[in-house]
Every structure is written in structure tokens, then in C-alpha cells.
């Protein structure tokens, strides 16, 4: 659960906050309750008290136009409604009654010199990533030709060896063994590596390899968008493998269908070349070029002409 103190600490470089009141409530939770990040923070809104309230110059001018009694009434309703925090943008100085009420209700009140619109934009981006649905999957995540590729399969099939071969061919490692995936936008899944395993690749017989040290800075990536899953299967698993799928195979990942390719592992097969070919073919499909569909149309035309 994200707290106000975490929000302050995580954004210290971009948004310098100063505590005014309610510091004892620094551990107050910021709950998403299924809401989008855009709904978790915004300009002062008395109708939606459950989001982070931002006071800009216009909001503070509107608030101070009320008499003291009416201000206290509205603010009491807002604070009792479960507001996570109140943020004053543009370096504004709050009226004393606002400070007193935040202290009384133990609601964090903070100030920052950042402009209100910029503050909201920065926090929406931050909250969208921080509160995004996440999962951890077993596999190797790579940047292959600019496409985020997740290699999966049962243990012992050579996922790490395949990743090492692809890295030696100029592609980049994102994560090995434990891949953290986050749905940061409605149609975007980002994958990254846990801090503990960054730059490391485990290969049977060699142990842990520091890819960044061995291959250089350009051999690793911090994050990539997941676009393709390459699933390795044993050559004996005929019941799980379709030689020529007529429809694209997809796998559900955090509620999104991700394109999936299945490759058989057998002696003499160059899997690195096959993965590169699968990625190039996926790029063509993303551009609207369907090789199998074009072939089937060509075949239908040939059958039609031969029947005349």
C-alpha cells in the first residue's frame, strides 16, 4: 500500500515538498480502489474527497472567498471524506484555518514550488506506474530488434543459453528468471528486472554472469514494453505444438492479449535465428502485413484460375 511519505520520498528530485501540518499522518495510505491514476489526484474538488487535493492559485482564491464559517464547513466535509493529502502548489501560503483543520484531522498538508498543472501531471504519471497491476513471471525478458520479447518454457530447455546467444548477437537483456510485469496504461505492459537481479544471467555450468560487465553498457536495458512471448517446447510434445497455426496465438497477461510464438527445441535448430525471424515477422504484423493471409489469398486465386 502506497503512503504519503513514500510519495514524498519517491518524488523528492522532481517535486520538493515541505510539510506544513499533519506530519504524524505521513503513513496515511493512498488507495486506488480500482480508480485510474488520473482520478487519484486533481485540482480542489469538494465532490470527490477521496483523491489527493491540489490547491493552485485559482483554487486558493476560490477557497478564501468564502467566509470562515463556510470554509470550515466545506473543509470538514472534505477531510472527513478520507482525503489522502492536500498539496499547495506554486509555493502558496495556506490560511491558518486550513492548517489548523489539517492538524486537527491528522491530514497531511504539504507545499511545493511546482506549478499546479505540472504537479498534477507528474503525480499522475507516478501514481499510474506505482499503483499499476503487477505480476512476476518465470522466464527471460529481452530487447530483440527493439521489441520486448519474453522467453518462457519449462526448466532445462535452454532459455538462458538462448538469451546469451541473442545478447552476443547485439540484443539486450532486461531480466532473467524473475520478470516483473506492470500494466502501466490500458494497452501497455512494461517489464523490468528486480533490483537484486539486475544485469545478471544464470547459465547452467557457468553460474551467474554479469552481462553488463562482460558485454558492455549497451547489452542491458532497464525496461521494455512486452510485445511478444516466445514459448519453448520439447520436440516430443506434439500435442502442444501446432506446425502452421491459421490464427495468431495469444496469451493473456494482466488482462491484455499478447502475441505468442511456440518454438520446438531440438538438436540442430538455431533458436536465436528463429527468435529473430519471429520478431521480424511480428513487426510486419504490427504494421499490417500478414504473410500467411497473403499466401492463402494467392492460393485461393490459383485454385480459382485452375478451375476455369
Curated annotation (Swiss-Prot):
Domain of life: Bacteria
Catalytic activity: [HPr protein]-L-serine + ATP = [HPr protein]-O-phospho-L-serine + ADP + H(+); [HPr protein]-O-phospho-L-serine + phosphate + H(+) = [HPr protein]-L-serine + diphosphate
GO biological process: regulation of carbohydrate metabolic process
Binding-site residues, ATP: 153-160
Region annotation (Important for the catalytic mechanism of both phosphorylation and dephosphorylation) ranges: 201-210
EC number of the protein: 2.7.11.-, 2.7.4.-
Alphabetical list of Pfam families matching this protein: Hpr_kinase_C (PF07475), Hpr_kinase_N (PF02603)
Active-site residues per Swiss-Prot or TrEMBL entry: 138, 159, 177, 243
Family: Belongs to the HPrK/P family.
Protein name: HPr kinase/phosphorylase
Provenance organism: Bordetella pertussis (strain Tohama I / ATCC BAA-589 / NCTC 13251)
Gene: hprK
